[in-house]
C-alpha cells in the first residue's frame, strides 16, 4: 500500500479525491470518493478533462498495484481471475451473513492468533498472515500485502479490541474477494436449518449413476474452480443418511417440490406437519345463528369478575382455608434446607455483600485497636504516676534525714 505510488503521486491522488491523509489505505472510502469525483470531473458533466484523466491514471495504477501485490505473494489455493473479470466484493459474496461470517466469537477469535481452529474470515486471514511471513521470510507485513486485523490495526494505529471488529468489517466489505485469497466454501457458515436427505442407496452400489461435484475457489453462481466428479458408493455416514436408512417413513414429510441437490440448507419444517382443514364459512342463515357461529370460531373468554366481589371478610366462626398450588417438577430437586438460597444472586449483589462484610471486619479490627491503645495508655499513665510517687517519697525522706 505504501510502495505502489510515489510520494508525489500519492499527494496528487489525495488532493484529487478530497480525501483526508489519515484515511489513506481505506479502499472502500477511497472508492466512494473516486466515484463521486468521476461524476464531478466527467467532461460530459462539464468537468475538467485533464483532471479526470489524471485521476483515472492514478486510481488505475493504485488498483493494479494492489492486485499485483496479492498476485505475487506466492501460490494460491483458489483460482485467480483477471483484474477486470472479478469485481465482486466480500460483502456481496456473503450478502446477509457477512457480519456473522466475519467473526464467529470475538472473545476467542481476537485472543487466539496462530493456534485458532476457527474458520471465520478474521481467523482465516490471521492464519494467512503467518503463512505469508513464513513463505516470504519477512519480519513484518503491511496493509495491502496482508488484510488481517493486526495489519489493519497497525496501519491505522488502533488497538486490537472488541470495538475494532465493526470498523474492520466496514473496511473489508468493499474489498474484492479475489484479493483476500479466501476459499469461500470453507468460511464459517452460521446458517441454521435442516439439510435435505440423500436419496436411498441403490441395491447395487456400482450401478449408481449419481455424480457429486467438489469445487474450490471464491467463485459463485455456478462458476466452479476445479471440478472433480466421483461416483456415489451408496454409503453415507452423515446424519441425514443414517436417518434415511433407519427411518424411511420420514420421506413422506417432504413435499415433492423440495427435490433439490443434497447439502442445500432449507428452513426447518413448520410446527404443524399435518394439514389442517380451514374453517368452512357459514352458510347464509339467520342473523343470530351467523353471529353465534362466528363467535364459536374464537376461544371463549373467561367471565369478567370484579375483584371486590370475591373478597369476603373472615368471621370468628369461619376460618380461611389454605390455598394450595401445584408445585412444578423442578422444585422437587431443590434442597430441603430452608436457610439455603434458592435463587442465584447476581454479581453486583455478591460484590456489595462482600464489601459489607469487609467493612464490618474492618470496623471490628479498629475497635480492637482502640481498646489496645487505651489499655497501653492507661498502663503508661499508671507507671508514670507510680514513678513520680516513688520519687516524691524518696525526696521527702532525704529532707527528713
Swiss-Prot record:
Residue numbers on the Extracellular membrane side: 396-401
Entries under PROSITE patterns matching the protein: DNAJ_2 (PS50076)
Organism whose genome encodes this protein: Hamster polyomavirus
Subunit text: Interacts with host Ppp2/PP2A A and C subunits; this interaction alters PP2A substrate specificity and localization. Interacts with host Fyn.
Keywords: Early protein, Host membrane, Host-virus interaction, Membrane, Oncogene, Phosphoprotein, Transmembrane, Transmembrane helix
Region annotated Disordered, chain positions: 213-235
Cytoplasmic face of the membrane: 1-374
Any one Gene Ontology cellular component term annotated for this protein: membrane
Membrane topology qualifier: Single-pass membrane protein
The protein's name: Middle T antigen
Family matches, as InterPro entries: DnaJ_domain, J_dom_sf, Papo_T_antigen, Papo_T_antigensf
Biological role: Plays a role in transformation by modulating the activities of cellular proteins involved in control of cell proliferation and by acting as a functional homolog of an activated tyrosine kinase-associated growth-factor receptor. Recruits upon association with Ppp2/PP2A the Src tyrosine kinase component Fyn, thereby activating its kinase activity. In turn, MT becomes phosphorylated and mediates signal transduction pathways leading to cell cycle progression and cell division. MT also plays a role in regulation of early and late gene expression as well as viral DNA replication.
Cellular localization per UniProt: Host membrane
Keyword Mitochondrion applies: no
Superkingdom, natural source: Viruses
S-adenosyl-L-methionine recorded as keyword: no
Membrane spanning residue stretches: 375-395
Domain called J: residue spans: 12-75
Amino acid at each position: 500500500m505504501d510502495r505502489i505510488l510515489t510520494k508525489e503521486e500519492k499527494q496528487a491522488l489525495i488532493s484529487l479525491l478530497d480525501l483526508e491523509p489519515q484515511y489513506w489505505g481505506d479502499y472502500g472510502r477511497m472508492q466512494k470518493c473516486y466515484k463521486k469525483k468521476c461524476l464531478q470531473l466527467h467532461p460530459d458533466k462539464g468537468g475538467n478533462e485533464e483532471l479526470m484523466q489524471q485521476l483515472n491514471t492514478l486510481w488505475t495504477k493504485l488498483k493494479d498495484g494492489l492486485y499485483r501485490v496479492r498476485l505475487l505473494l506466492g501460490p494460491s489455493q483458489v483460482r485467480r481471475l483477471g483484474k477486470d473479470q472479478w469485481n465482486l466484493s466480500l460483502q456481496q459474496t456473503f450478502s446477509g451473513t457477512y457480519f456473522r461470517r466475519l467473526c464467529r466469537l470475538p472473545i476467542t477469535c481476537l485472543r487466539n492468533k496462530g493456534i485458532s481452529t476457527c474458520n471465520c474470515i478474521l481467523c482465516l486471514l490471521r492464519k494467512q498472515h503467518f503463512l505469508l511471513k513464513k513463505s516470504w521470510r519477512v519480519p513484518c507485513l503491511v496493509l495491502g500485502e496482508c488484510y488481517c486485523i493486526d495489519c489493519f490495526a497497525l496501519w491505522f494505529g488502533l488497538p486490537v479490541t472488541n470495538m475494532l471488529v465493526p470498523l474492520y468489517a466496514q473496511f473489508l466489505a468493499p474489498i474484492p474477494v479475489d484479493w483476500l485469497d479466501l476459499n469461500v466454501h470453507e468460511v464459517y457458515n452460521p446458517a441454521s436449518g435442516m439439510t435435505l436427505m440423500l436419496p436411498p442407496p441403490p441395491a447395487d452400489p456400482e450401478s449408481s449413476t449419481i455424480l457429486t461435484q467438489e469445487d474450490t475457489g471464491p467463485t459463485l453462481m455456478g462458476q466452479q474452480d476445479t471440478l472433480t466428479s466421483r461416483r456415489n458408493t451408496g454409503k453415507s455416514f452423515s446424519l441425514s443418511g443414517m436417518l434415511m436408512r433407519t427411518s424411511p417413513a420420514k420421506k413422506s414429510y417432504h413435499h415433492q417440490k423440495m427435490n433439490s441437490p443434497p447439502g442445500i440448507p432449507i428452513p426447518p419444517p413448520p410446527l404443524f406437519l399435518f394439514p389442517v382443514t380451514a374453517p368452512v364459512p357459514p352458510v347464509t342463515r339467520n342473523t343470530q345463528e351467523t353471529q353465534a357461529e362466528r363467535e364459536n370460531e374464537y376461544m371463549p373468554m373467561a367471565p369478567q369478575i370484579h375483584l371486590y366481589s370475591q373478597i369476603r371478610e373472615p368471621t370468628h366462626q369461619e376460618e380461611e382455608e389454605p390455598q394450595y398450588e401445584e408445585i412444578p417438577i423442578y422444585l422437587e430437586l431443590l434442597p430441603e434446607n430452608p436457610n439455603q438460597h434458592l435463587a442465584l444472586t447476581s454479581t453486583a449483589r455478591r460484590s456489595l455483600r462482600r464489601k459489607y462484610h469487609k467493612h464490618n471486619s474492618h470496623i471490628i479490627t479498629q475497635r480492637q485497636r482502640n481498646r489496645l491503645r487505651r489499655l497501653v495508655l492507661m498502663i503508661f499513665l499508671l507507671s508514670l504516676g507510680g514513678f513520680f510517687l516513688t520519687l516524691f517519697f524518696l525526696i521527702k525522706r532525704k529532707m527528713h534525714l
